[in-house]
Amino acid sequence: MAAVQCLTFLFLFLLQNATSASPLPLFRRPIQSNHSNFVKHPRRSQVVFPVNHSSCDLFAGEWVRDETYPLYRSKECGRGIIDPGFDCQTYGRPDSDYLKFRWKPFNCNVPRFNGVKFLQEMRDKTIMFVGDSLGRNQWESLICMISSSAPSINTHIIHEDPLSTFKILDYNVKVSFYRAPYLVDIDKINGKTTLKLDEISVDASNAWRTADVLLFNTGHWWSHTGSLRGWEQMETGGRYYGDMDRLVALRKGLGTWSSWVLRYINSPLTRVFFLSVSPTHYNPNEWTSRSKTSTITQGGKSCYGQTTPFSGTTYPTSSYVNQKKVIDDVVKEMKSHVSLMDITMLSALRVDGHPSIYSGDLNPSLKRNPDRSSDCSHWCLPGLPDTWNQLFYAALLY
């Protein structure tokens, strides 16, 4: 009888301890892989998020001035890393205050990026950005952040199309960018460039499946018209269309991508993120309705000449709000398979962060006409994509 009572007590003790275990914090799922050292991260001694993790929204906050920024200088990235179109300081941008702002969530603190820690956690792994030139913008940012905070590492870079890879040899880490602006396939059919809404190319699929961490993005290319349109016809359901409602096309394309993720990605083994739409600042009507206390330069016809973020924590409108809703809906339908990096609002506040005319891609005559030539789509490096990567770092490792 005593033995039975002892076993009963032991069972109840174990049951109580098992059921009272604390849940994983927000943005921290078990990370596993076919590599033996890619295991669930132990709880850190430094508490980054509050006790009530559900109250921590990394993407709701405000921009605060921080004199310790930027995280790096462009010369620390290595030769040929930053695209000339993103290297604003090198190509003549006269102001630098836009580099002195840090994103501060309301209810939690974002860990400062630590390149050595990142490489230790990602040893023997491949991190792959997949998407358009905004994905490239973020890829180059992460390379710079790693190179500046772990300066003694041996590296090698391969620039190819569609796949470019930055290798950190000491840790056997690969940070890659796969160019796929629509995510779905685009190919010649009967002599016409065709956007195939129901297909992802075999080459893309094979490349993506080699990654341990995937971060996808798409958006801007779906709304391009005229000479900027990247296709001549669309194909879906075995039928061809000269055009269709772009949001319908985006929804179909993302449905194809979603099916691919659910079919080929083993969630416990591979982490998948999706970057929400990165806003543009070409239309001054989006910000002229703001209060007179706004810090924005009035009268501008684009992002040119803007040197400070929007004051406040909200942005009145955006030309990409409908695209964002489509992306949000698709990702939410996938539940735990994909984590949404909802950077749209925090980025919309950074009208000051674009290259404008300070781009190595513009000749002098184009720079003399900023209202027509300014790049208000991409972002300066150093700059806003560094914040995207700090949030990515927090979501991935904490």
From Swiss-Prot:
TM annotation in the entry: 1-21
Broad class of the protein's primary localization: membrane
Subcellular location: Membrane
A GO CC term assigned to this protein in UniProt: membrane
Motif segment (GDS motif): 131-133
UniProt superkingdom: Eukaryota
InterPro entries (UniProt xref): TBL, TBL_C, TBL_N
Keyword Membrane attached: yes
One annotated GO molecular function: O-acetyltransferase activity
Topology relative to the membrane: Single-pass type II membrane protein
Keyword terms: Membrane, Signal-anchor, Transmembrane, Transmembrane helix
Keyword Phosphoprotein: no
Family: Belongs to the PC-esterase family. TBL subfamily.
Role of this protein: May act as a bridging protein that binds pectin and other cell wall polysaccharides. Probably involved in maintaining esterification of pectins. May be involved in the specific O-acetylation of cell wall polymers.
Miscellaneous: Contains 2 motifs that are conserved in esterases, but it is unlikely that this protein belongs to the catalytically active pectin esterases.
Protein name: Protein trichome birefringence-like 45
Organism: Arabidopsis thaliana
Lineage of producing organism: Eukaryota, Viridiplantae, Streptophyta, Embryophyta, Tracheophyta
